[in-house]
Amino acid sequence: MVLQHALCDAVLLPALTPYLIYDNGASLKGKGMAFTRARLAAHLREYQRRYGTDGYALKIDFAKFFDNIPHDRLIDSIDAKVRDSRVRSLLEMLLAPYSADVSYTDTDFDAVPYNSLADYETSGPRDGSRILHRSVGIGAPVSQIAGVWYPTPVDTYCKVVRSCRYYGRYMDDIYILHHDRDFLMSVLNGIRRQAHALGLFISEKKTHITPLRQGFTFCKIRYSFTSGGRLLMRPVRETFTRERRRLKTLYQLAACGKISVTDYKDLYHSWRSGWIRFDCHRSLISLDKTYRRYLNDLQH
């Protein structure tokens, strides 16, 4: 892991960052989920000032994104910017463990997405006769850089070739705002061609063109405008359902002494502080009641 951090910090990031668009928001210093959400909000407000709330949002999602990044094309794309055989050899060594023996199936993985979890759970015979050199895992430094860097041709196509002003990407999630639905359809078809050239797959179930008046969801936030033109940013319901379950688990852990009451309070308030900036006051008040009920039980 130390090697990966050194490679990314000293070589890959300095070499690749100048080629990234500003609205590529993941895993970079000074950026992240909060950055991407703020940029989308800024884009929506600017769009509204220019065009009102008439228009559309194109939301695109890559299917099994990290599982389907081809090692050879990823390394070639980095090598074109770094030009160092030692770096290429390191990348080949670091990515090799993610290659999979798929000799148990004759599935054409150029036509359908590879699923590493399904592959892991499959008990078919493997004889090493067919190795799939894809997947970069999730979480490792090189994997994160791969997710940020590899779809750059899609970013360039949208921002430079198609002049999409209101465009942003967070790893495998993309949004584009425009007043012309036909234009967005044309851009989507172009992105499909770019994705095919990269060996990536677009999730048709999660890819939609939605009227702005209806609102749309991106990175777990529902964006919509009120009749008066105010932008609303509401976390999806799942956010609070999951936290309610977590609160119950924390309460049970505190009740049996595995965590302290102070830990229980700090963990909840830490989570809550991340959501107070959004339009979810009623949901937070409801969850606060659950929090206080558990806290009262712990203190008596």
Task: Label the predicted regions.
Residues M1-H5, D9, A34, A38, ...:
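Non-catalytic, well-ordered alpha-helical scaffold segments
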Residues C8-P70:
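Active-site-proximal segment of RNA-dependent polymerases
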Residues V82, R192-L200:
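A common structural junction motif
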Residues T17, V160-Y166, G199-S203:
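Surface-exposed helix-capping loop/turn segments at secondary-structure junctions
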Residues S27-F35, Y175-H178, I209-R213:
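Beta-rich nucleic-acid/ligand-interaction surfaces
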Residues L7-A10, I191, A195:
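PAPS/PAP-binding and catalytic site of the sulfotransferase fold
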Residues M1, H5, S116-H133, G137, ...:
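Right-hand nucleic-acid polymerase module
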Residues H43, R49-M171, I176-V187, T210:
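Conserved polymerase palm-domain catalytic core
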